[in-house]
Amino acid sequence: MGRTLENKQQIVGELKGLLAETELALVLDFKGLSIKEMSDLRDRLRVTNSVCKVTKNTLMRRAIDGDSSWANLDSLLTGTNAFVLVKGDVGAGVKAVRSFQNEFKKSETKGALFEGKLLSQDEIKAIADLPSREELMAQIAGAINAVATKVAVGINEVPTGMARALKQHAEGGDS
């Protein structure tokens, strides 16, 4: 028995809501993945504030219909698709998918859409190679701290150097 019209409309509404919060959409070919493997992927994505949805291409097509920012996704809507919708840290979401794919070697990325632009496989890989938000914040904090430390050492060095010069002058004057 197929889905009712109300059920399909509910799914399309849910997809529209998810897409409104999504920054990046990855389209995966999930053919050959077991339920356990899909659950593993979903668990990995949950940590990164991302979600994996398996839905019919026609329902996704209806969800993106009329939304220009998602219009380019239409070209990827063929075959068996799982849609990874990344909400927050785009790099972390893509890394989670890539680590899953490297481990199971059953799923491949068909494409991705970021800010209305279809991304190539190289661009997707480049996003995965980016440091996470936390790593970037740590690097920036470290750089700021290093500058502050150098300034503090420099400020402290002026009176210390002056004291050494005076001491040397005083010792030199006694002899």
From Swiss-Prot:
InterPro entries named among the record's database cross-references: Ribosomal_uL10, Ribosomal_uL10-like_sf, Ribosomal_uL10_bac, Ribosomal_uL10_bac_type
Transmembrane regions listed in the UniProt entry: none
Keyword match Ribosomal protein: yes
GO MF annotation terms: large ribosomal subunit rRNA binding
Coiled coil: none
Pfam families: Ribosomal_L10 (PF00466)
GO-annotated biological processes: translation
GO CC, alphabetical: ribonucleoprotein complex; ribosome
Keyword tRNA-binding: no
Keywords, alphabetical: Ribonucleoprotein, Ribosomal protein, RNA-binding, rRNA-binding
Cited PANTHER family: 39S RIBOSOMAL PROTEIN L10, MITOCHONDRIAL (PTHR11560)
Protein family per UniProt: Belongs to the universal ribosomal protein uL10 family.
NCBIfam families linked to this entry: PRK00099.1-1
Subunit structure: Part of the ribosomal stalk of the 50S ribosomal subunit. The N-terminus interacts with L11 and the large rRNA to form the base of the stalk. The C-terminus forms an elongated spine to which L12 dimers bind in a sequential fashion forming a multimeric L10(L12)X complex.
Role according to the record: Forms part of the ribosomal stalk, playing a central role in the interaction of the ribosome with GTP-bound translation factors.
Protein name: Large ribosomal subunit protein uL10
Organism: Synechococcus sp. (strain CC9902)
